[in-house]
Curated annotation (Swiss-Prot):
The keyword Transport applies. The gene is atpD. Produces ATP from ADP in the presence of a proton gradient across the membrane. Residues 203-223 are annotated as: Disordered. This is V-type ATP synthase subunit D. GO terms for molecular function: ATP binding; proton-transporting ATP synthase activity, rotational mechanism; proton-transporting ATPase activity, rotational mechanism. GO terms for biological process: proton motive force-driven plasma membrane ATP synthesis. PANTHER family: V-TYPE ATP SYNTHASE SUBUNIT D.
Length: 223
């Protein structure tokens, strides 16, 4: 506190800083509320995605067992070698209240994975089931990645709000009180000093007035 110079200029600056800090708290709280709403929306989406993934996994492996049983493991393995690989997974960045949140996007090959001509029915259905499984897996990865990132942003924003409310703003207010107290004390001292000076001046003037001869008495004496 002793490092703060108690001047009126610093008092004005600290008041401006206080207003900015309070405005910052309001904006950060709005951001946090928006992120929390987004977070809970993603929680529901993530639960649905997980449920869909479990179902897709069951269907895919059931279709695989049927294909191996009816078409033969060698046919299924040979067909799997002809399936084009996933072209890639990209992470697009979205701006959510100033926070960069990734969105995963997978690019699957166009058209059917296997040609219906010459591919046994059960093997063909297994390839379709595993594509649905891959799509469900990407959806889960996307929602859970976004969920994790938004959760981190909520924690970061909460820490910033707490720092402003519990450290920065109280510190600025304490500095304002200190400067005000010093300025008020100086004002009282200046007022007291001025009163003393004024009193001395008035006393000196009274003494000088009392020591002067009365003009009317001098005129009467001359007559």
């Amino acid at each position: 506190m002793s490092q703060v110079s108690p001047t009126r200029m610093n008092l004005l600056q600290r008041r401006g800083q206080l207003r900015l800090a309070q405005k910052g708290v309001d904006l950060l709280k709005k951001k946090r509320d928006a992120l929390v709403a987004e977070f809970f929306g993603l929680v529901r989406e993530a639960m649905e995605a997980r449920k869909a993934l479990d179902q897709a996994a069951k269907e895919a492996y059931a279709a695989l067992l049927l294909a191996q049983a009816f078409d033969g493991p060698e046919v299924v393995a040979g067909a799997a070698l002809g399936v084009p690989p996933l072209e890639g997974v990209e992470a697009e960045v979205e701006n959510v209240w100033g926070s960069k949140v990734p969105r995963l996007k997978a690019t699957f090959p166009d058209g059917a994975l296997l040609s219906p001509v010459g591919t046994p029915a059960y093997t063909l259905e297994a390839s379709r089931a595993f594509r649905r499984y891959a799509e469900a897996l990407i959806r889960v990865a996307n929602t859970e990645t976004r969920l994790k990132k938004i959760g981190e942003e909520i924690k970061k924003t909460t820490r910033r709000v707490n720092a402003l409310e519990q450290v920065v703003i109280p510190g600025i207010r304490a500095q304002i009180r200190f400067i005000q107290q010093v300025l008020e004390q100086r004002e009282r001292e200046d007022t007291f000093r001025l009163k003393r000076i004024k009193g001395k001046i008035e006393a000196r003037e009274a003494e000088e007035e009392g020591g002067r001869p009365n003009p009317q008495v001098e005129i009467g004496a001359g007559l």
